[in-house]
Amino acid sequence: MAILFAVVARGTTILAKHAWCGGNFLEVTEQILAKIPSENNKLTYPHGNYLFHYICQDRIVYLCITDDDFERSRAFNFLNEIKKRFQTTYGSRAQTALPYAMNSEFSSVLAAQLKHHSENKGLDKVMETQAQVDELKGIMVRNIDLVAQRGERLELLIDKTENLVDSSVTFKTTSRNLARAMCMKNLKLTIIIIIVSIVFIYIIVSPLCGGFTWPSCVKK
């Protein structure tokens, strides 16, 4: 349960972004930004197992993507904090800035606030409840269809690091077990070859030494 991605944009022009994990965030976000009207507004778009929350103020869009079980109030608290910090830092410069002009500086702010609002659960319960009521007043939830340029339905694909780590550990463990099994198999085969060779040599040499006890070859 976390905030997965955050972006600040002017219309469809991305000014700063940060992703918590891998995924096709930009491809999906570009479709979302193109559908957001320029007037001041707050809205949530559900899409599959994820929610897209945004605040639009003075043509600047503050947007984040969360799991569908992440509290909307926490998402909008995050967006409000990002909006306040961005406006304080850049002011009217955002209205004419080039794409990614603020990314080198503000992406670290997005990362820090994303982590803080995803993990912080120590708020006073009364204040938290009141903040939820106040924050969600007038914020609608509206369905949205995302269509890629090729005309196919666009889906958000998330590549969370934990899954990759688990797969890597499983692969390494399987490889190690396979190598151990092959080593034991080779060892058994080597022992069998040695035993067969000894028996074969014994059978060949025995007639030359006068029998199976080798009486003519063993000195008494």
Swiss-Prot record:
List the Gene Ontology MF annotations in alphabetical order.
SNAP receptor activity; SNARE binding
Q: Which residues lie on this side of the membrane: Vesicular?
A: 210-220
Q: Which residues carry this modification: Phosphoserine?
A: S167, S168
Is this entry keyworded Protein transport?
Answer: yes
Post-translational modification N-acetylalanine, affected residues:
A2
The family database entries (Gene3D superfamilies) matched by this protein are listed as:
1.20.5.110, Longin domain (3.30.450.50)
The membrane-topology field of this record reads: Single-pass type IV membrane protein
Q: Which Pfam families does the protein's record reference?
A: Longin, Synaptobrevin
Q: Name one GO biological process term.
A: phagocytosis, engulfment
Positions of the Longin domain? 7-110
**Origin superkingdom:** Eukaryota
Provide the Gene Ontology terms for cellular component. endoplasmic reticulum membrane; Golgi apparatus; late endosome membrane; lysosomal membrane; neuron projection; phagocytic vesicle; phagocytic vesicle membrane; SNARE complex
Q: Which residues lie on this side of the membrane: Cytoplasmic?
A: 2-188
Supply the InterPro entries for this chain: Longin-like_dom_sf, Longin_dom, Synaptobrevin-like, Synaptobrevin-like_transport, V_SNARE_CC
Keyword DNA-binding applies: no
Q: What keywords were assigned to this record? A: Acetylation, Coiled coil, Cytoplasmic vesicle, Endoplasmic reticulum, Endosome, Exocytosis, Golgi apparatus, Lysosome, Membrane, Phosphoprotein, Protein transport, Signal-anchor, Synapse, Synaptosome, Transmembrane, Transmembrane helix, Transport
Record-annotated membrane-spanning stretches: 189-209
Places the protein is found:
Cytoplasmic vesicle, Secretory vesicle membrane; Golgi apparatus, trans-Golgi network membrane; Late endosome membrane; Lysosome membrane
Tell me the subunit arrangement. Component of the SNARE complex composed of STX4, SNAP23 and VAMP7 that binds SYT7 during lysosomal exocytosis. Component of the SNARE complex composed of STX7, STX8, VAMP7 and VTI1B that is required for heterotypic fusion of late endosomes with lysosomes in liver cells. May interact with STX17. Interacts with PICALM. Interacts with RAB21.
Q: What does this protein do?
A: Involved in the targeting and/or fusion of transport vesicles to their target membrane during transport of proteins from the early endosome to the lysosome. Required for heterotypic fusion of late endosomes with lysosomes and homotypic lysosomal fusion. Required for calcium regulated lysosomal exocytosis. Involved in the export of chylomicrons from the endoplasmic reticulum to the cis Golgi. Required for exocytosis of mediators during eosinophil and neutrophil degranulation, and target cell killing by natural killer cells.
Per its record, how is this protein called by name? Vesicle-associated membrane protein 7
Instruction: Name the lineage.
Output: Eukaryota, Metazoa, Chordata, Craniata, Vertebrata
Gene of this entry: VAMP7
